[in-house]
Every structure is written in C-alpha cells, then in structure tokens.
Amino acid sequence: MLNSRSELLDQFLRQQGIRDEAILAAIRELPRERFIPEALSHQAYQNNALPIGEGQTISQPYIVAKMTELLELTPTSNVLEVGTGSGYQTAVLAKLVEHVNSIERIKSLQWNAKRLLKQLDIYNVSTKHGDGWKGWESKAPFDAIIVTAAAESIPNDLLFQLKDNGHLVIPIGEESQQLLRITRQGEEFFSEVIEEVRFVPLVAGELA
C-alpha cells in the first residue's frame, strides 16, 4: 500500500499542482482503504470517487487535496466541514488543524465516521448529526468552511458564519457544477471559480 500511496502522491497529486507538503503528508499517512467498503479496497489509492453507502461517495484524492489547499489553513484555524461522509476528508483536516467541526445529515454515516476516527486515534474532531445548510452557529465564526456536496445555491447561513477573510470552499450547481472559493471581507463576499467538478447533492432540511 505504501508504494501505491507514494505513486499517487508523487506521480499524480504533484503533477496536478498540489504543493502543500502538510496536505500531502496527511494523505500519505491516512489509510484510505479504511474509509471505503472492503470490496473496493483495491481501488483505495486510485484517483476515483467511490461509493460509501446511503447514496454518498468518498471524493477522489485530488479533490480532497485541492479543496483543502484552497482553505489556506493554519494550525489554529477554526474549521467547519459540511458532509462528514466516510470521515476521510475530516481526517485530512484533523491532521492539519487543532480541531475540526463536522456535520452529517445521515446518522449512520456520522456514527461510522466517528467510530473510525477514534480507531485511528484521531480525537480532535467534533461531529454533529444535523442540517449542513444551517452550518453550526454555536461553533462559529469559522476561518474555513468546506462543503463536500453540491448545493443549488450558496447557503446564506454558511456565508455569515465565516470570519472576516475566511474562506468557504463549495461545489455549486446541479447537472453542471463548479467548485467555488468564497472569501469574506467585512460584509462583502468575493467568489472565485476554481474548476468544474461532480459531487452528490447537498440536501437541505432532511435528516436521515
């Protein structure tokens, strides 16, 4: 597996422009096969999104690395992840900052991710079963918010839970999706289009 990880990192992520050594180290250290069904473990270090049940997926390693890099994290960044999913993106974030807050609307995924993170000795994460569209007001404001499912429009609650100069990285759209980075400056928000992407939809309101 170490050879597969090294190959992924050295030949693919770096070729794709990922430069943050801390992010590359986090991905290198984490056993991605633990976050996916055992039957798919042979694909763990390929650059593919993979199903994790409940109609959800684990993002491809490049997208995990790219979205994380766009957050411009420091060790003391207050981070919110919307969409815990398998917990893989959560674990990458947890290697980079002192504490991660993560919301998941599907209870079984939230529970499984919480259990797995503990098995991997990752304890600097708070998880919540809730509606990601609303953010996590009691933990706000955030230096960085990462959304791992595509919203039809940008949730206002997430914008106003950002700190000044904070970044929101979010896929937007339905059939055609774009990855955006939104930066707050006072009461204004500035948006950059990063690239085209494909994510499962961010479902508002409904908990499962």
Curated annotation (Swiss-Prot):
The GO biological-process annotations, alphabetized, read as:
methylation; protein modification process; protein repair
Q: What does this protein do?
A: Catalyzes the methyl esterification of L-isoaspartyl residues in peptides and proteins that result from spontaneous decomposition of normal L-aspartyl and L-asparaginyl residues. It plays a role in the repair and/or degradation of damaged proteins.
Regions annotated as coiled coil: none
Q: Which UniProt keywords apply?
A: Cytoplasm, Methyltransferase, S-adenosyl-L-methionine, Transferase
Q: What is this protein called?
A: Protein-L-isoaspartate O-methyltransferase
The family annotation for this protein states: Belongs to the methyltransferase superfamily. L-isoaspartyl/D-aspartyl protein methyltransferase family.
- In terms of superkingdom, the source organism counts as Bacteria
Q: Which organism is it from?
A: Aliivibrio fischeri (strain ATCC 700601 / ES114) (Vibrio fischeri)
What reaction gets catalysed by this protein? [protein]-L-isoaspartate + S-adenosyl-L-methionine = [protein]-L-isoaspartate alpha-methyl ester + S-adenosyl-L-homocysteine
- One Pfam family linked to the record: PCMT
Q: What Enzyme Commission number(s) does the record list for this chain?
A: 2.1.1.77
Active-site annotation: 59
Q: Which GO terms describe its molecular function?
A: protein-L-isoaspartate (D-aspartate) O-methyltransferase activity
Q: Where, per UniProt, does this protein localize?
A: Cytoplasm
